[in-house]
Amino acid sequence: MSRKYFGTDGVRGKVGEFPITPDFAMKLGWAAGTVMAASGTKEVIIGKDTRLSGYMLESAMEAGFCAAGVNVALTGPLPTPAIAYLTSTFRADAGVVISASHNPYYDNGIKFFSNTGTKLTDEQELEIERLLVSAIEGGAMTCVASDKLGKVRRINDAAGRYIEFCKGTFPNSLSLTGLKIVVDSAHGAAYHIAKNVYRELGAEVISINDKPDGININEHCGATHMDSLQTAVMIHEADLGIALDGDADRLMMVDSKGQVIDGDALLYLLAKSAQQRGEQVSGVIGTLMSNLGFEQALANLGIPFKRAKVGDRYVVELLKETGWRLGGENSGHLLMLDFTTTGDAIVASLQVLRALLESGAGLADAITELNMFPQVLINVRLNGNAAVGLSHPSVSDAVATAESALGNDGRVLLRKSGTEPLIRVMVEAKDAVKANQYAELIADAVRAVFPA
């Protein structure tokens, strides 16, 4: 059975349109609860970000789980990695996050964590889908006996527990005293958490975009819109800036000069710092989107590098397969398995700050030897079958032309987004003009297949 609803990061879409409806959410809760109950599940934890639609979907998921005989514990707005952590520490059987991460407020999504705080396997998601399809298409949604229904409770100290966990990943011998940091919480799930973590560790914190109203999440702010953070760092003459996305699993940073430091650069800094401390860095996992310059810089340190499919779940899978501990995406999902089971922007930022304090260097100076290849990414809106566009002869010809011209001095990647109706065209080259030229060539070929 192929995937019908689960993308690279759970189920996601526009609120009010199938599948992000209360009816679907209830049936998904029931299907997941039924699968989990069969293996002994007694309780799941449900968290969410700050989207207005989170209330509706949370209630629907509750009903579905309770109908399947599974108890529910609610946390309120919390970062995605906080739910992964709490699922494990509370000995819950599974965790659920209601969030569309970096997407606008009118989108939402639902994703699951296992009892170890890791994302569900493909096999588990397919089993949930099997029951879900039967409930949607055949109406086969049953309810357990009245005395077996699930109950709902609220975890009142969830945020405080997670703050202490984050602080616990930072060495006791170090302090952030003397650092001025601007923090952009994207009006998202970490709005009441991130600033307090850094303050309690001694930093002077200027907090921006920390007043969620249900519809301003990720709106011209956070890890996908860095302008406001860059401006704030310069205005306040801060040492650096930290940007999270709506569910705080993605990290981007800004140096004291207002320059953006992306996930590849941060991952390089983390690997180099660990190596300098004498820790064994067996290798680093990136993705198909990771920059060639990043790969070459790791090679100069003697650190092996492998690419996973795009999506943090696939980075985790390859980390487990190789036994390596460090990986991530240039978009800012950073995986540090010595500390967390999933991407955690706050924890990752603390390890970057640790690296800077130990080296005595500023953020820009700490990565001077990293020479990134110019990378051009063009998103083409999809209004048809992606497979048709990706395999169309004219598109294949454009890709072949670009690859032949670039040779070993560049890369071409063409793929369908796992979270949005887009085909992503990425071209990387030593020469920025060539990168842009061939990205436009391929994008034009894709647009011709899917005219607006």
Swiss-Prot record:
InterPro entries: A-D-PHexomutase_a/b/a-I (IPR005844), A-D-PHexomutase_a/b/a-I/II/III (IPR016055), A-D-PHexomutase_a/b/a-II (IPR005845), A-D-PHexomutase_a/b/a-III (IPR005846), A-D-PHexomutase_C (IPR005843), A-D-PHexomutase_C_sf (IPR036900), A-D-PHexomutase_CS (IPR016066), Alpha-D-phosphohexomutase_SF (IPR005841). GO terms for cellular component: cytosol. It comes from the Bacteria. One of its GO terms (biological process) is carbohydrate metabolic process. Coiled coil: none annotated. Its EC number is 5.4.2.10. Activated by phosphorylation. The modification Phosphoserine is found at S101. Catalyzes the conversion of glucosamine-6-phosphate to glucosamine-1-phosphate. Belongs to the phosphohexose mutase family. This is Phosphoglucosamine mutase 2. The gene is glmM2.
